[in-house]
Amino acid sequence: GSLIAMGEPVGPPEVARALIWRCREESDRLGLRPVFYQIGETYWQTYLDLGLGLVKLGEEAIVPLHDFGLEGRERADLRQAWNRGKRGGLSFRVAPVEEVPSLLPRLHAISNAWLEDKAGDEKGFSLGSYDPDYLARFPVALVEAEGQIVAFANLWQAPAGAELSVDLMRHVNEAPKGTMDFLFIELFLWGRSQGYARFSLGM
């Protein structure tokens, strides 16, 4: 078996390095293999000092937001997707944390329908899963059509306007084609308007 840590430790470097070693010691005590998933370059040497190897599984996709827009030839596909959503009656808004509890029944229904359509269970770990207590801690981006929520994503917001990302994304089966494209384009535009530097699309 394996003991898997998601991402790197958060805190001062000297404390973080000690925590990485502590994870290795705990893995050894339990007879498990230590795995550090989705790490950056900061502590590579520490992982190598543990006797671990580095395996590249992918790269994090980052969208710079400070100059993001829909103008120009290079953004024609995005502009068309956004216009198609607007013509199809889609609208976007971000529900603040205070509003989220009242939205949870509808979000749960959307999530259940989405899972049923995918014929699977929640994945969890590196992908978000539906948990009402967890969702209620974040603003939620909503796409609506004819006054009904057709897609949503919770927002992760780094301090000081550094980074924006999403963890859980779901949509109704009958959502108009291109709904998720519309959601992400609107998120990029919203993030720029709020002063965020970048949007992480994950690996």
Residue ranges and their predicted role:
Residues G7-V15, S27, D167-G178:
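A short, internal acetyl-CoA/4′-phosphopantetheine-binding micro-motif in the GNAT/acyltransferase core
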Residues G1-S2, L32, F36-L54, H66-Q80, ...:
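A conserved beta-strand-loop-helix scaffold within acyl/acetyltransferase catalytic domains
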